[in-house]
UniProtKB/Swiss-Prot annotation:
Signal peptide: none annotated. Cell wall formation. Adds enolpyruvyl to UDP-N-acetylglucosamine. This is UDP-N-acetylglucosamine 1-carboxyvinyltransferase 2. The keyword Cell wall biogenesis/degradation applies. The modification 2-(S-cysteinyl)pyruvic acid O-phosphothioketal is found at residue 116. Pathway: Cell wall biogenesis; peptidoglycan biosynthesis. It comes from the Bacteria. InterPro entries: Enolpyruvate_Tfrase_dom, Enolpyruvate_Tfrase_sf, MurA_subfamily, RNA3'P_cycl/enolpyr_Trfase_a/b, UDP_GlcNAc_COvinyl_MurA. The active site is at 116 (proton donor). CDD domains: UdpNAET.
Length: 419
């Protein structure tokens, strides 16, 4: 069993570069199936989710070369075969294969997706959109069968009952090669959606409105190869900004797009965090006094649900009482009992997280229950006095590229141990 060992209490300093966006690349890779030639992605993060996606692509017949942060995929050999359940089940974003396989073959047989357990994240919105486009859905054991029964998938006017990044991207990808026009209303607006649309448009798609709540896709017959730069990971950037404010004595975070983090940075400023925003970087100073605040997550451009857990350890340094309300994922509270083991004055009351600061954290044995909870525990371990041991670290490695090396370069005493 692998684990992370941290000897905390050491102030961090230096510079850390943000990698390409996990939430983009897990959608970009399956979308490449639609291309009729080689596609190259630059800025691909070195995370286990990417390794899983590459393995699935190769099992399907794609030719893949991955060197440094450059990923080259030739999808011309991809075959219409059932997706391996074991691989699919370990990866929540595997549902992005639905749209690309429907767009290319008009059918797909896939295992139901896995990933972090954050409560209900139903794929009903995806399936409702596909059904509007002429797809029939059936189930057999642990597999889901999607088929147009030999017909070409067709355009449709689709209203998303709730705002969903995954369903918006999946529908957009499926519609790219559909017959006719597709309109998605109440679409999610996240930067990762714009990134996927940019890739598809550079391949020859006709997509307009990505980043707004109405996206229009005019189906095309062919998509060619292209080269695409993955956007920086705004969640990784926010995580390192929170870490720098919590335990830094001057940390510069580079490869940052400020406009993707405006709501997050606004809440930090409300706390009293001192930082300087540069063209593509943010410098976080050593902090003095911080004020407790209330956080409420909401769809982009609101405060990202993926950042409430990594921010929690910093909130524990603030003076006063505050509340965290996650309106997106009801089970994003699993980091709370682990932080309590470390001495945090924090609890869950009526589904909301309530904290009282400042809390003095001490090292403990804790368990990462999901990706962002794992990030919170890493930050807490760096803040704490003494030794912290984090288990179940596969979640952390799913989403944070080279995290041990990056933190070590900032001066952290952190190791990944293979037991």
């Amino acid at each position: 069993m692998r684990k992370i060992i941290i000897n905390g209490g050491k102030a961090l300093s230096g510079e850390v570069a943000v990698s390409g966006a996990k939430n983009s690349v897990v959608a970009l890779i399956p979308a490449i199936i639609l291309a009729d030639d080689i596609v190259i992605l630059d800025g691909v993060p070195a995370i286990s989710d990417v390794d899983s996606l590459i393995e699935i692509m190769e099992l399907m017949g794609a030719t893949v070369n991955y060197h440094g942060d450059t990923l080259e995929i030739d999808p011309r050999g991809v075959q219409d075969i059932p997706m391996p359940y074991g691989k699919i089940n370990s990866l929540r974003a595997s549902y992005y294969f639905y749209g690309s396989l429907l767009g290319r073959f008009g059918q797909a047989v896939v295992g139901l997706p896995g990933g972090c357990d954050l409560g209900p994240r139903p794929i009903d919105l995806h399936l409702k959109a596909f059904e509007a486009m002429g797809v029939e859905v059936s189930y057999e054991g642990e597999n889901m069968n999607l088929s147009t029964n030999g017909q070409k998938i067709h355009g449709a006017h689709i209203y998303m009952d709730t705002i969903s990044v995954g369903a918006t991207i999946n529908t957009m990808v499926a519609a790219t090669k559909a017959q006719g026009k597709t309109v998605i209303e109440n679409a999610a607006r996240e930067p990762e959606i714009i990134d996927v649309a940019t890739l598809l448009n550079n391949m020859g798609a006709h997509i307009r409105g990505a980043g707004t709540d109405i996206i229009t896709i005019q189906g095309v017959q062919k998509l060619h190869g292209t080269r695409h730069q993955v956007i920086p990971d705004r969640i990784e950037a926010g995580t390192y900004i929170a870490l720098a404010a919590a335990i830094g004595k001057g940390v510069k975070i580079t490869n940052v797009l400020y406009e993707h983090l405006e709501s997050f940075i606004a809440k930090l400023e409300e706390m009293g965090v001192r930082m300087t925003v540069e063209e593509d970087a943010i410098f976080v100073e050593k902090q003095k006094s911080l004020k407790a605040i209330t956080i409420k997550t909401s769809p982009y451009p609101g405060f990202a649900t993926d950042l409430q857990q990594p921010l929690t350890p910093l909130l524990l340094k603030a003076d006063g009482r505050g509340t965290i309300i996650d309106t997106i994922y009801e089970k994003r509270i699993n980091h709370v009992p682990e932080l309590m083991r470390m001495g945090a004055d924090i609890s869950v009351i009526g589904g909301q997280i309530v904290y009282q600061g400042p809390s003095r954290l001490t090292g403990a044995q804790v368990k990462a229950t999901d990706l962002r909870a794992g990030a919170a525990l890493v930050i807490a371990g760096l803040m704490a006095e003494g030794k912290t041991e984090i288990t179940n670290i596969e979640f952390i490695l799913r989403g944070y590229a080279s995290i041990i090396a990056k933190l070590t370069a900032l001066g952290a005493d952190i190791q990944l141990i293979e037991d």
